[in-house]
Amino acid sequence: MNISITFRHMDATDAVKIYASEKIAKLQRFLRGPMKAQVTLSCQQDRLHSVEVDIHAGHDHFHAHETSEDMYASIDKVSDKIERQIVSAKDAIRARRKGADRAAQHLPVDVGEE
């Protein structure tokens, strides 16, 4: 697991860095294999805090962006968005596999030549 955190237009604090790392690291449980995450934390002029997350895990890519007045709230919201994306992608894969199994059950069986 590789998590890279970048601060833009704000001072880097250990508390925010640790909080973001822990929230993103929890997403690893939904993924198979190693995960590489790029987290960008920024503060805009009008006191809005934005968080952008890119996650690469094998052939999968997930991206989310969130802006709010509180940095911790933005981190929570973006983590929830990524979690929903991962679960949705996994459910889609399961549905495709289940559909293939059902289609195979309805194929006619060749009993051979008589």
Regions found by a protein language model. Name each.
Residues 1-114:
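N-terminal, polar/charged subdomain of small-to-medium soluble alpha/beta proteins
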